[in-house]
Regions:
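N-terminal mature ectodomain segment of secretory-pathway/periplasmic proteins
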Residues: 2-68
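Well-ordered beta-strand positions enriched in small/hydrophobic/aromatic, beta-favoring residues
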Residues: 12, 39, 60, 106, ...
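Solvent-exposed loop/turn segments connecting transmembrane beta-strands
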Residues: 19-23, 45-48, 85-86, 131-133, ...
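A sequence-level detector of short linear motifs
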Residues: 24, 50, 64, 69-71, ...
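A short, sequence-level motif marking secondary-structure junctions
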Residues: 28-34, 55-58, 75-78, 169-172, ...
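Flexible, processing/modification-adjacent segments and terminal tails
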Residues: 57-136, 157-162, 211-215
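Gly/Pro-enriched, hydrophobic low-complexity segments
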Residues: 113-212
Length: 215
C-alpha cells in the first residue's frame, strides 16, 4: 500500500473486448503527484474526445476529434464524463490499493474451498455518500496461498441479486506494484484488459496540453 501511495504517475488503457474483438478503448494518464488527468476515448456519438483536468476542481480543457472545444458547457460536460470514466476505470484497475480509502467498509465474510484452493472472502461496502455509487457491494476472493485476488463478485447500484462476477487474471508487475491486467466477465463473452500499463516517474508536459499524444 505504501509503495502504491508513493507512485507519482500511472498510465493505462481500459479496453473492452467482446466476442474476441475490441469494442472500446479509454486511455488514461494520471499524474498522481500533481492531481491531474488526461482521459481519451469515444463519447456516446462515437467521436474521440480528450479531457484534461485537475481532480480537485475538475477544471481544464477538452478536445473533440483533435480540435479544442471552446464552448464552456461542452468542456464541462466532457470533463465530467472523463472524471466519471477515471473513477470507474482506475477502480477496476487498482481496487486492491483502495481498500482503506475513507468511506470504505470491509469485513471478513467467510472462507470457501475448492479442490485445490482456499479463499478468504472479503465483503466491501461503502458509507452513504462515498464516491459516485455508494450502494455498490463487492466480494473479493483472496487466494490464501498467493494472497492475490482470483475473482470478485459485485452487486452494483441498481442491480438486483444474484451478484455478477469476473475472474482476475494476468497478475503483472507494473513498476513496484502488481496488478491484474485482465478480467474475464462471468457468463458473458466479455473481457476487460488493462493495456499499456506503466508507472513512469513523470509524463511529458505535452500530455496535458496537446490535442493528441503518443502512448
Amino acid at each position: 500500500q505504501e509503495t502504491w501511495d508513493r507512485l507519482p504517475c500511472f498510465r493505462f488503457d481500459f479496453v473492452v473486448v467482446r466476442d474476441g474483438k475490441e469494442v472500446a478503448r479509454f486511455r488514461h494518464w494520471w499524474d498522481r503527484r500533481n492531481g491531474r488527468c488526461r482521459v481519451e476515448g469515444p463519447n456516446d456519438q462515437g467521436k474521440q474526445v480528450a479531457a484534461i483536468f485537475t481532480l480537485a476542481d475538475r477544471k481544464g480543457i477538452a478536445f473533440v476529434e483533435g480540435i479544442g472545444e471552446s464552448d464552456p458547457a461542452l468542456v464541462a460536460e466532457i470533463i465530467q464524463n472523463g472524471y466519471e470514466r477515471w473513477v470507474n476505470d482506475t477502480y477496476w484497475a487498482m481496487m486492491p490499493f483502495k481498500l482503506h480509502d475513507p468511506g470504505v467498509r470491509i469485513r471478513y465474510a467467510r472462507n470457501e474451498r475448492t479442490l485445490e484452493t482456499v479463499y478468504d472472502v472479503l465483503e466491501l461496502s461503502f458509507v452513504p455518500g462515498t464516491g459516485l455509487t455508494p450502494d455498490d457491494r463487492y466480494w473479493l476472493y483472496v487466494n490464501r496461498k498467493t494472497h492475490l485476488i482470483d475473482r470478485w463478485e459485485h452487486i452494483l447500484t441498481g442491480q438486483k441479486p444474484p451478484p455478477s462476477g469476473a475472474s482476475w487474471e494476468a497478475w503483472t508487475a507494473i513498476g513496484p506494484v502488481r496488478l491484474s491486467l485482465q478480467r474475464r466477465i462471468q457468463g458473458k463473452p466479455v473481457m476487460l484488459r488493462f493495456e499499456n500499463a506503466a508507472a513512469p516517474a513523470a509524463f511529458d508536459e505535452n500530455v496535458f496540453n496537446f490535442a493528441s499524444v503518443r502512448n
